[in-house]
Amino acid sequence: MNALFSRNVAALSPSATLAVSAEAARLRREGVNVVDLGAGEPDFPTPKLVAEAGVRATQAGKTKYAANEGILELRAAVARRLSLLSGGRPVNADNIVVSNGAKQSVMNACFCLFGGREKVLIPSPAWTSYPQIVHVARATPVEVAGDPEWSLKVSVDELDREWDESVKGLIMNSPGNPTGAVYTLAELKAIAEWAKRKGVWIVADEIYRRIHYGDGVAPSFLDLPDDLLEQVVLVDGASKAYAMTGWRIGVALAPRELARTMAALQSHTTSGANTMAQWAAAEAFGNDLVQPEVEAMTAAFRLRRDYLVGRFRKELPGVEFVEPMGAFYLFFRVDDVFGKSVPNATEFCRRLIADEALALVPGAAFGDDRWVRLSYAASDEALRDGVDRLVRQFARLASEKADASKQKAG
């Protein structure tokens, strides 16, 4: 630990996903034809009606501080949309807190619920920021390995094996980043029942809920009975479904007292989210004319998913991967080509960008350095070119490994 810094950031490390994008940008500035399939954001523009709402808010002078919990118009629009997505169940706008992105919503929840000498279970592989957020909250993240035979999801049995009296929280993410795995409603119900028995809070990150390749939206904790939601914080936002990553709008739905506490915490950190962005997000969640664009983007992601899965099965038949049922990532194993020169996925990705100018994210960012994440939030041309480069790299590394074995045998 650097003696200049406090214990609050002792275990903190920078985002590996952003580091990949930064390296890709550096190579582009040098004139290299880089294919970047590392980005975790939709490649589509923000819907026109949404962008225009942000402009109107600016022109109308809606540029002052917003309430810490968010403008009522956005909270009401989110409440209505969540209600519609979950079969019309009542959702109260007073239980919603708007933040500067879903990441801040997760952080607000963790800071309000967890602290020193307490543990938070995190199914792994997991989004790179979850354990970092828990560390900054001075709690201890405990990664629970997902089952490779079950799309790297975890069951109650795995959670139970890691539980002790110090476990106070569980962070869930479905559809998942980096795996694209989706928990069924029955699986969510079993986990919620387990958490209730154990007195464990669930922070459910459902930012990818609308990007689902099954029927309708992905199953949600919000689809469960009220008695299973008493210790659940549901996190969502505008970034993924509405292609609004740069607008920085996240939301949390929580029990009333916790929602008030999260808003109070935010009042002492960032204050309310960007006012103009909130008006744009109110249009996104509230205007029914915008929703077909979400469906169109999801349909495009589905076609890309199908293309990737088809090429992997045909051209990389020995490579294990999780078939994504949501989000826009393909997570695949690369340890078959590990050797002296490429001992892990981090080095695999370093070699990949050096040899083929293809940027992917190593699994170390998500807790398992045998895997790599490929984002198909990219153009069809970039995907075709990217897979071509990836296939060449697998062949190159397999040849290097075979040559090394021959030399060792000789």
Which positions does each model-derived feature cover?
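Short gly/ser-rich anion-binding loops that grip negatively charged ligand groups
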Residues: 40, 61-68
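Conserved N-terminal alpha-helix of the aminotransferase class I/II PLP-enzyme fold
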Residues: 65-99
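Generic short alpha-helical segment signal, independent of protein family or function
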Residues: 55-63, 83
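Substrate/cofactor-recognition hotspot
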Residues: 9
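PLP-dependent class I/II
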Residues: 2-5, 13-35, 41-57, 87-410
